[in-house]
Design a protein with these regions (language model features):
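Structural preference for beta-strand elements that scaffold enzyme active sites
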Residues: 29-33, 74-76, 111-113, 160-164, ...
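Acidic (Asp/Glu)-rich catalytic clusters
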Residues: 25-27, 62-73, 99-111, 153-157, ...
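Aromatic-rich peripheral "rim/lid" segments of glycoside hydrolase catalytic domains that contact
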Residues: 155, 164, 169-184, 196, ...
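Alpha-helix N-cap and loop-to-helix initiation/capping positions
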Residues: 90-96, 132-144, 179-189, 217, ...
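Substrate-binding cleft and catalytic face of glycoside hydrolase catalytic domains
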Residues: 38-39, 70-88, 97-214, 282-286
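N-terminal carbohydrate-binding accessory modules
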Residues: 19-74, 88, 386
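Noncatalytic carbohydrate-binding groove/subsite architecture in carbohydrate-active enzymes
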Residues: 24-27, 37-58, 180-300
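Sec-dependent N-terminal signal peptides
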Residues: 4-13
C-alpha cells in the first residue's frame, strides 16, 4: 500500500490544552509518528487547502501542520515519495513535493521516514516494461532498481533518517507476492533492494513493511524469509507491521493477542519491530475483507455506514478501551519496539472513510474531525506518565 509535544490547538479563537503529548509521554519507549500528505504542508504555507498528488482532500488542512509539529516527533509522507510521483518516467525525477515535505519536517526537528522505495503498487508504469510494452529482463530490472534507489536515497542522504525499502512483498498466507518484481527477479529483488539502499546511505535505517502482520501465517512467512538473510548480514534494521485494524475483529482481544505474538516472532529474528500505519476502523467489515490491499473495493450500503451522524457512547467507550488495551500490550514489549506511527492525522482525512467502501464516515484516528485529541489519548498517556521521572531517557 508502510509521529506528539504539548497539545495546544487553535480552532478559531479557542484553544484546547493538554498537559502532555503521546510523543513526550512515550519518549523513553519509542518514537511516535504520523503520516503526512503534501497538502497539509502546502496548506500551512499558503493559508489555503491544496489537493495532494492523488487529488484527495477532506476537511480543513490549514492548521494540520502546526498540530503535527506540536504533537509528533516522526513523520512519513503518505504519497509524495512514492515511485509514481518522484520517478514518473525513466530518467525523470521530480523531488519538488518530497523536498518540501522533508525540509518542513527537518525544520521542525522531526525524524523522517521515506515511504517507499520498492512497492508493486503506485510504481510508475514504465518500470517493468520496455518500449514495446514487454517485460524487461532480469538485468534491466536490476539496473533500473539500483539507479532508482541510488538516486532517491542519495538525494535525501542526511535528511531522511529511515526508509521503507520494500513494502508489502508477501501474501497473507506467508508466500511471496507475485508482483512484477517477483515475476522477473524472484525473491532476489528484496535483498537487492536492501543492498542498494545501504550502499547509497550506510547510515540510514532500512525497514521491511507489510499489512496483516497480525496473522500468524503471514508474520511467520516473512520472518522465515528474512531469517537467513539477516544471519548473513543483510542490513535490515527492523521489520514493520502496518496495523490497519478493524474493531469488530477484536473479539476477546484476539487482534491484540495476535500482535503480541507477532512482536515476539519478529524479536526472535534479533531485530526490533514498529507499527507503521496504525488506525482502527469502527465500521462493519465487508464479508471476506481483511488486510489493506488497496485493490479490494466494495459497494456502499447504509447498513455498512452506521455512524454517519456520530458515534454512540457505547461505541466510543469500546474504542477507548481497545486503544488502552493495545497500548498496554505495546508497553509490555517496549524493548522490541522502535516506533509507533499513526496513519492520517484526524478522522476527516483518514483513508478509512473511503476504504474499502467509498463515502462512509469512520473514526479511525486519535484526533476527531475538529482536530481535537480524543479522550483515550489522555488515558494512554496516563499508562506511563507517573513513570517518566524514574526511567532512563531513551528517545530524544
Amino acid at each position: 500500500m508502510h509521529r506528539f509535544l504539548v497539545f495546544v490547538f487553535a480552532v478559531g479563537m479557542t484553544a484546547s490544552v493538554q498537559a502532555q503529548s503521546l510523543a513526550e509521554a512515550y519518549r523513553d519507549y519509542w518514537y511516535t509518528g504520523v503520516s503526512v500528505n503534501q497538502w497539509q504542508v502546502e496548506a500551512d504555507l499558503s493559508g489555503q487547502n491544496k489537493h495532494d498528488v492523488t487529488g484527495f482532500i477532506s476537511g480543513d488542512q490549514t492548521k494540520d501542520w502546526d498540530i503535527i509539529a506540536r504533537n509528533f516527533n516522526f513523520v512519513v509522507a503518505e504519497n509524495c515519495m512514492k515511485c509514481e510521483v518522484v520517478h514518473p518516467q525513466e530518467g525523470v525525477y521530480d523531488f519538488t513535493l518530497a523536498d518540501q515535505f522533508v525540509n518542513k519536517a527537518k525544520a521542525a526537528g522531526m525524524r523522517v521516514l521515506g515511504h517507499a522505495l520498492i512497492w508493486h503498487s503506485q510504481c510508475a508504469p514504465w518500470f517493468h516494461f520496455d518500449k514495446d510494452g514487454k517485460p524487461v529482463s532480469r538485468e534491466v530490472l536490476k539496473k533500473r532498481m539500483r539507479e532508482h534507489i541510488y538516486t532517491i536515497v542519495s538525494h535525501f542522504k542526511g535528511r531522511v533518517d529511515a526508509w521503507d525499502v520494500v513494502n508489502e512483498g508477501f501474501e497473507d498466507d506467508g508466500t511471496p507476492r507475485k508482483s512484477l518484481f517477483w515475476q522477473i527477479l524472484g525473491t532476489d529483488y528484496i535483498p537487492l533492494a536492501f543492498q542498494y539502499a545501504h550502499e547509497a546511505d550506510p547510515n540510514a535505517e532500512l525497514y521491511y513493511n507489510d499489512f496483516s502482520m497480525n496473522k500468524p501465517t503471514k508474520v511467520e512467512g516473512v520472518c522465515r524469509f528474512f531469517r537467513p538473510l539477516i544471519e548473513q548480514g543483510l542490513p535490515v534494521t527492523a521489520i514493520g507491521m502496518q496495523g490497519h485494524m478493524i474493531l469488530e475483529d477484536n473479539v476477546d482481544n484476539s487482534v491484540i493477542k495476535q500482535y503480541d505474538h507477532s512482536i515476539n516472532t519478529i524479536a526472535a529474528l534479533g531485530v526490533p519491530t514498529f507499527f507503521s500505519e496504525l488506525d482502527l476502523s469502527v465500521l462493519p467489515n465487508p464479508y471476506g475483507f481483511s488486510g489493506a490491499n488497496i485493490n479490494d473495493r466494495f459497494s456502499y450500503s447504509p447498513e455498512k455506514d452506521p455512524f454517519k451522524n456520530g458515534l454512540t457512547k457505547e461505541k466510543e467507550a469500546e474504542i477507548n478501551q481497545f486503544w488502552v488495551d493495545f497500548y498496554k500490550m505495546l508497553i509490555s514489549h517496549k524493548d522490541n519496539i522502535i516506533r509507533v506511527n499513526f496513519w492520517c492525522l484526524n478522522d476527516a482525512n483518514s483513508w478509512r472513510n473511503d476504504f474499502p467502501i467509498k463515502g462512509r464516515t469512520d473514526y479511525a484516528t486519535l484526533f476527531d474531525r475538529q482536530n481535537q485529541p480524543k479522550g483515550m489519548v489522555q488515558e494512554i498517556i496516563n499508562l506511563v506518565q507517573p513513570q517518566q521521572t524514574t526511567k532512563k531517557n531513551k528517545r530524544k
